[in-house]
Amino acid sequence: VIPTPGVVSMYTSLGKAVESPKFSGQQSLSFEYDFRQFSYYNEMKLAFGGNINIFNILKIDATYESGKIKQKTGLFARILQKNFSVIMDYPTDGNIFKNQSDLAATSHLSPVYINSVTFGRMGIISIESESNYEEVKKAFKLALTVKAVGGELQLDATSKELLEKAEIRILVYGGAGSEVAKLVMGFDKFQEFIVNGGEFSKEVPGVPIFFTCNYASDNSIFSTSFTTN
């Protein structure tokens, strides 16, 4: 509980929580993933939730800006490891501003405020393969569920060969290292991402991967949408 909410007090409290001996990697809020087939690179904007330049972010050769994927099958996925959330209570009097006049003066703008921030790790994965979609989907789902021994996923020979031959790109947010986000490629990096992603620590607590907003007018939930090009 933060007695006097504010940016400084929030980060101070967060720092104390991270340094606590009880702050360990066995208490993640959740691990979840979603995936879908794609044929054009711009479809991957759905994973990012915005109109971004997929070619720049995933370092796809400019010659493919016609949009269609290079290989027979494409699968993109978003893997989320939610470690913990920082949540602000609703204002006791219902007004996020200091007084009613400030709320009234901004009502025509429909202002919103950030109500919660979730820290964790996220991977946006692109897999292109000459195999059919059902085979790619099966291999991908298996990679997320099989055991790892000695840092290697215990995949069957067929699934491992498929993933080794596939073109895999992973944009990782919140992993180990000083970079907030980094792009890695290939089966070995895909395997490393899966095997090493189960825990977090005070050294690797994660980064903000989600936030929720509320309208200042009545504290109802704010939502948005976008249209891909």
What residue spans do the PLM features occupy?
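Membrane-permeabilization and membrane-interfacing ectodomains
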Residues: V1-N229
